[in-house]
Amino acid sequence: MSELFEKSMATLELPQVLALLADCAATLEGKERCLALRPLTDLDDVARAQEETSAAVKMLILRGSPGFSGVKPVSASLQRADMGGSLSTRELLDIASVLRCARGARDYGDSEEKTVISHLFRSLTPNRFLEDSITNSILSEEEIADSASSELASIRRHMRSTEARVRDILQRLISSNQSKYLQESIITIRSDRYVVPVKAEHKNAIPGLVHDVSSSGSTFFIEPMGVVKANNELRELMAQEKKEIERILAELSAQCAAHKEDIGEDYTLLILLDTIFARGQLSLKMEASQPGLSERYLRLRGARHPLLDKKKAVA
């Protein structure tokens, strides 16, 4: 665009109008696309864009918003997965979110009445199997479900029973006459091992391994010899758990890579729909109407600047 054109757009306050439009978009890329919009010069392009907006307005009135807030950027993640990389829980959840939004939008767009944007909804390819595989395995960014695999469930059962055994041994120590040697009657963890806080002057009264000392030097965190074997078992189980989680994430990543084309296309379509429905929402907010188009002239009847209050504007 020429400098004169940009100056004209600034004078007409187009950037402010586009900012209002961007506020109506639900996705980050949708907002960016709204801000980057410039006036169309081809009459056919203008007519198509107007029809898209009008179709979105009608659907918003009849069905409400399709909801695009769950659409997260996934292109970089899909590319890395395609190269054999293992994705993080956050990346996999974002991909599942895109698939969920694609499924919701596809259902939203199902209608006997065809519009100029119907083909966009029909082009979406939800993958419920992959979506469920991810969401059933990953409960949150920090938590993998026990049910993610039978191996993980088995490892965690053993971890819980071993941990209970360690705690039981330490609880008996805390409840015995040896408790007088403790700084506090609690069980704590140092270096992934269960320990008890022992007074410095009695550190030799409880045989075991010292894993830490308080900054004041008054407390020694000791792993009693009676729990060393069980703690070792627990450490081994934790390593097995970590390895199995890595395997699960790698497997889910490979599944995403296998469907990267469809997922990427869904993302592109959802961003496009987000911008179209942003136009529809702003149209409703401004109480705008679709104009008739002509190649020969421009006739403004009852027109007003969209930033002016309708009640105060003089048409």
Regions found by a protein language model. Name each.
Residues I155, M159-T162, E241-I248, L252-I276:
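Intracellular alpha-helical coupling/juxtamembrane segments of multi-pass membrane proteins
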Residues V196, E261-A315:
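Conserved NTPase motor "head" modules and their coupling/switch loops across ABC/AAA+ ATPases, GTPases
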Residues F220-I222, V227-K229, E233, M238, ...:
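Conserved mid-sequence domains
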